[in-house]
């Protein structure tokens, strides 16, 4: 079997047992990228030389009898909005074309400290704004299950790279579903941790009260391994929590006896594809058989979550992206007459259509006369959603819903239908608005396309999510399915 077919924990075992060299593992993935990425389009930059150099260093350590750390020799690919020292960090935007990061993000420091190997930077929707990775200024990324379909977004490059077996692990960012939805579309495990569980230091901001670094992997154990080793307090991000990070691999048990799971009626109404509904219902039956108690409940505020999310996230984006003006940061136009002209033309040339749309919306809702009517009201809705979830979690260990109302859609199908594109995130957005942790795991196939099951946990209770996800995974075969490229 080719090394790229293996999971991260299988590779780690082989490396630790000296069955394979780290350089062989890295080379296997570099060869795979060379073979299939012209079809998939996941990578914006491959750090081949750096990766091979690091692999040789680790092999040298092993030859001296030293043990590697928790991520020893495992390649990880990084969404192109997370800073890796010396590598490009473009946010898939012309605004940051040619920019190389002078420092490592906190999560990258942790990967490097645990002997992980950074393989390269992967494609995304510009500034993480989108649900299909069609908003990249550089290339289209395709779904490895069907090259005519989107991989999801905004972390579509991360998901496509793992699904195409170009990398065993990938980091993305999740603001409103940008890790979970691509995981669902590409048949992967994707986790958005609790807001504050992972540091945002070094991740270029979109919506500062929503953004969270997330993980994509082939199975639940790989996700637990990566999460355990990148989560935790960082004094450079004051929103990170000083709460001990457990060893999530200890919660990978099949038995769900005593676990209570709630099913929100609002997530099973109009707009849900019947094939997705069927797959979710079958998954719930599996969890019941494994000992979980399951009951329906109502979460009325979910109907307002999408509107609140787009107001809050766009407001924060308009503020965060104001710095890219051609004067201090970002692309500067070559054709200008004065300073004001530089602002207008640089931003017009540097930002794509969706980024401009959200900046304009955000500026509008923050402007005098509209602040109270929109932004302030959205914050009130956010508090209402949080309170409803807090009450629900007094009764349940977890909540389950579909990750997305449909499987992956065709490239170009929704790009001009903004409402349809935004509705794709209807089930992931409320979780982000509340700051809760959630994971998408594969739970079925329809017409050759994967379907995702979303497991939502209480604040800092990722352990419950891992337990339920692992229980389902061990009772099914969906995580073993691989696309034919």
Swiss-Prot record:
The active site is at residues 79, 154, 178. GO terms for biological process: translation. Keywords: ATP-binding, Ligase, Nucleotide-binding, Protein biosynthesis. Allows the formation of correctly charged Gln-tRNA(Gln) through the transamidation of misacylated Glu-tRNA(Gln) in organisms which lack glutaminyl-tRNA synthetase. The reaction takes place in the presence of glutamine and ATP through an activated gamma-phospho-Glu-tRNA(Gln). Belongs to the amidase family. GatA subfamily. The keyword Glycoprotein does not apply. It catalyses: L-glutamyl-tRNA(Gln) + L-glutamine + ATP + H2O = L-glutaminyl-tRNA(Gln) + L-glutamate + ADP + phosphate + H(+). The lineage of its organism: Bacteria, Bacillati, Bacillota, Clostridia, Eubacteriales. It is an enzyme of class 6 (ligase). It comes from the Bacteria. It holds the Pfam family Amidase. One of its GO terms (molecular function) is glutaminyl-tRNA synthase (glutamine-hydrolyzing) activity. This is Glutamyl-tRNA(Gln) amidotransferase subunit A. GO terms for cellular component: glutamyl-tRNA(Gln) amidotransferase complex. InterPro entries: Amidase, Amidase_CS, Amidase_dom, AS_sf, GatA. The keyword Cell inner membrane does not apply. Heterotrimer of A, B and C subunits. Its EC number is 6.3.5.7.
């Amino acid at each position: 079997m080719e090394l790229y077919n293996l999971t991260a924990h299988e590779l780690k075992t082989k490396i630790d047992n000296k069955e394979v060299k780290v350089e062989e593992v890295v080379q296997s993935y570099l060869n795979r990228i060379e073979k299939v990425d012209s079809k998939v389009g996941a990578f914006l930059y491959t750090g081949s030389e750096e990766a091979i150099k690091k692999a040789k260093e680790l092999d040298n350590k092993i030859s001296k009898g030293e043990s590697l750390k928790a991520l020893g020799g495992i390649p990880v690919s990084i969404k192109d909005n997370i800073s890796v020292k010396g590598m490009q960090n473009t946010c898939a935007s012309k605004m940051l074309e040619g920019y190389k990061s002078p420092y490592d993000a906190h999560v990258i420091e942790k990967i490097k400290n645990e002997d992980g190997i950074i393989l390269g930077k992967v494609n995304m929707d510009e500034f993480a704004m989108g649900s299909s990775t069609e908003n990249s200024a550089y290339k289209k990324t395709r779904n490895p299950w069907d090259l005519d379909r989107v991989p999801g977004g905004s972390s579509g490059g991360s998901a496509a790279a793992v699904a195409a077996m170009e990398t065993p692990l990938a980091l993305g960012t999740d603001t409103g579903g940008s890790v979970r939805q691509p995981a669902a579309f590409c048949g992967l495990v994707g986790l958005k941790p609790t807001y504050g569980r992972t540091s945002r230091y070094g991740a270029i901001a979109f919506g500062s009260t929503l953004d969270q670094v997330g993980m994509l992997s082939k199975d639940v154990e790989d996700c637990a391994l990566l999460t355990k080793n990148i989560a935790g307090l960082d004094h450079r991000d004051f929103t990170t929590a000083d709460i001990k990070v457990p060893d999530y691999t200890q919660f990978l048990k099949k038995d769900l006896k005593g676990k209570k799971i709630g099913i929100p009626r609002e997530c099973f109404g109009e707009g849900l594809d019947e094939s997705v509904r069927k797959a979710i219902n079958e998954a719930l039956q599996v969890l019941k058989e494994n000992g979980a108690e399951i009951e329906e409940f109502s979460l009325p505020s979910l109907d307002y979550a999408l509107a609140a999310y787009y107001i809050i996230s766009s407001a924060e984006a308009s503020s965060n992206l104001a710095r890219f003006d051609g004067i201090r940061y970002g692309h500067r136009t070559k054709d200008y007459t004065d300073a004001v002209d530089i602002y207008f033309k640089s931003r017009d040339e540097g930002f794509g259509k969706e980024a401009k749309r959200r900046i304009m919306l955000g500026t509008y809702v923050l402007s005098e006369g509209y602040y109270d009517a929109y932004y302030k009201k959205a914050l009130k809705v956010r508090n209402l959603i949080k309170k409803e979830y807090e009450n629900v979690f007094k009764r349940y260990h977890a909540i389950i819903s579909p990750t997305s109302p449909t499987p992956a859609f065709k490239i170009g199908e929704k790009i001009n239908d903004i409402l349809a594109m935004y509705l794709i995130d209807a089930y992931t957005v409320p979780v982000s608005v509340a700051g809760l942790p959630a994971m998408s795991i594969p739970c079925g196939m329809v017409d050759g396309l994967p379907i995702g099951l979303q497991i939502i946990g209480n604040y800092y209770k990722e352990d419950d999510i891992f337990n339920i996800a692992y229980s389902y995974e061990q009772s099914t075969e969906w995580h073993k399915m691989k696309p034919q490229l």
